[in-house]
Amino acid sequence: MTNTKTLEANISFEEALKELEEIVKKIDNGQESLETAVNSFERGILLKNHCEKKLKEARLKIEKITKLADSTVVLEEMEV
């Protein structure tokens, strides 16, 4: 786990989500020192933002595909 201010550009949604889940478990279980927990929290925020970005990109791509396939705009509310 890297605690840099940026996230690796090539990390997949699934990898980011898995790491985020692991961070949440460690923080919830109190398995880390305060300093490590704060660093993990910071990393978790980066991972959350990355996952949200990937989901938004996927939603936009689906909307574009739907528009092209039907030649009409079909926007449906998607739950995240």
Swiss-Prot record:
GO terms for biological process: DNA catabolic process. Pfam families: Exonuc_VII_S. InterPro entries: Exonuc_VII_S (IPR003761), Exonuc_VII_ssu_sf (IPR037004). The keyword Chaperone does not apply. Its EC number is 3.1.11.6. It is found in: Cytoplasm. Belongs to the XseB family. Heterooligomer composed of large and small subunits. HAMAP family: Exonuc_7_S (MF_00337). Bidirectionally degrades single-stranded DNA into large acid-insoluble oligonucleotides, which are then degraded further into small acid-soluble oligonucleotides. This is Exodeoxyribonuclease 7 small subunit.
